[in-house]
Amino acid sequence: MMVKNIYKQIFKGIKSYDEIVIARHIGPDPDALCSQLGLRDSIRATFPDKKVYAVGASVAKFKSFGNLDHPNYESLNNPLLIVLDVPNMHRIDGIDGLNYSNILKIDHHPKEDIKCYIEWVDTDKSSTCQMVTELLLNTKLKITRKVAENLFLGIVSDSERFSLKNTSISTFETTKKLLE
């Protein structure tokens, strides 16, 4: 699947739901949390009437990244579930009791067992934050200062300050655009 096409599919999927729950893996690292909070805040800035929640357990040492949400799942009407930075269902944090209609997945880990209606997995990317940044740069989703800061932190953290082998020219180009 061509990358430009996946951006359109993801944007269309986000646009078509009024309620969205964004989850990531248990025991989150900066890439998981920052991609989750960055995407949530971007969707909220772009579509202020949508109900968008970032869920899962809080981590005290990462509190400065932003606050997570605690929605009443019973009041939600089959929201879209977006899973970030998690390859399998049993590692998704914060979705117990959630009745969702579809799953949209963005991840840089190899595919495992999550059944999705839209899935973008690219193991050549440095981080899920890099992928979310590329999505935002190629759609009408807004990048606020806080969104850019979180996505930058996630990229720097998961690439171990640009030292891992999956750090590429596109990693630097994407990160540069966050700094502009």
Where are these regions (language model features)?
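Serine/threonine-rich low-complexity intrinsically disordered regions
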Residues: 2-4, 48, 72, 99, ...
